[in-house]
């Protein structure tokens, strides 16, 4: 239990209050606040916290907001450096918040006392600019990107041994405080059509296969990935076998295999095996899909991998390429 969300100001009082509720009802785990912007607090647990909820620590970010804009896409990163030395469980705070363009078809759903003036304003602006026919394209483009970011956000948390859980800001749009189109579902808890429940569940399930790999390769290097499984179900999985496949967009296998059976304990990240295969037979830029599945179950996950030729001949024609003005 938390005393509140993003509490600020008198932490001496909050600490005494936390001690009081612990004495009154010691059955639960308590924390002072679900994150805080208060100076001098919020980047490390308070003295009496049983667990810690935050966006960052004194060592760095623990959510993608401070990461994804500064590095190229890859699947082999986590937040271990930011949580090193943390002595209580850490939960990441209000992760996600990736905005999706308004679905203007939603306007007609408001038939009560609420009036979607924000959506109407966007629609009028598009109409003035002659872009009304692009609204669905904008929705899908931003929605697909948001879904990819949510996937990577959740998986990085799961890959980090020192992180015990995560909180999305919301799975659906929040209409109660300005415009917050942060959901993969709309304000009516309906799908926006940018992802499916089964797809989202691949990277957010009680048992989730995870991959540590680069996202971009050239044909002169081998594809490499470590496959692990996080088990947050209610029981140990005995003799779990992970099958994997690297395939092109038509489903044709570039390589595939499975790892030896092993136990997958509850509450742990279990390394199941490593994949290594050459890419030198690929002659043009390709999108590949790496998939990993716990055999005999519905638990599966997949990642898009991009492969480019190591060298590319360019027909320059009559164009002169030079770094000297006199030659130009």
Q: PLM features: residue spans?
A:
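Substrate-binding/catalytic cleft of secreted carbohydrate-active enzymes
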Residues: 1-173, 178-185
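Carbohydrate-binding surfaces of carbohydrate-active enzymes
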Residues: 110-328
